[in-house]
Amino acid sequence: MIFVGGIFMNVKAIMCDIDGTLLSSEGVVTPKTVEMIKKAREKGILLGLSTGRDVNSIQTLLKIWGIDGLVDMIVGTGGAEIYDYTSDLAKAQYPLDGRLIKSIIKHYEDMDCNFAIPEDGILFAPKDDEYIQMLAKADKVPYQVVDYNELLQNPKPKLIIICKPEDMDKIIERSKTFHSDEFKSSSLKTASVLYEYMDPRVSKTAGLIEILKLHHIDLKEIVTFGDADNDYDMTLNAGIGVVMAKW
């Protein structure tokens, strides 16, 4: 039980964003954070990660971050994937059609940017440049340059646009003119250099609802921590939503 806003709240789970939240500016989980995670779990509070990264890439990094064995559940790819350690259940939903992804890329083809599709712990890009190298290094995830015509014969979880921070406003402005008569999509800025497209049914809240059902936990019984636009919905819908400030 914790005391917030004049009432006691029975917290059953903590769901934490990774980049800019769980990880320090050096890209690690600090010993103090690990200690607090252990104390929470000793009280029966579950720990989950809710992130734009794909589940597979997160799982490969848990040991490096020093939290292997401390995570109970993962909401990945912005809510399109879930993995529950207790039941060993994995689920993916609402991918983007390959034809839609191609049309999005065409919409931005004259701009200074690159693209990435995260899948199976790998970032797949249509070309090799400083942008995909930067993202792969920052996320500690390998990347491969592939033929998107072949890759996009099947639906994919989401599309990431990578750009310079100073070009993000141009990317956002260009997004306002994208339209597809055949497919629906939503998009948002997820970092200073990342802009993402996904199915409009995908959100961290939707992923949380799906995975919390397995533990009979309501959204109002969790605390969330996040720092970016894709954390906004879970911050609003959680029992307590904590917004991380950048100093």
Predicted regions and their residues:
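Asp-based phosphoryl-transfer active-site loop
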Residues: 10-27, 235
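Short, well-ordered alpha-helix to beta-strand connector turns
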Residues: 11, 71, 156-157, 238
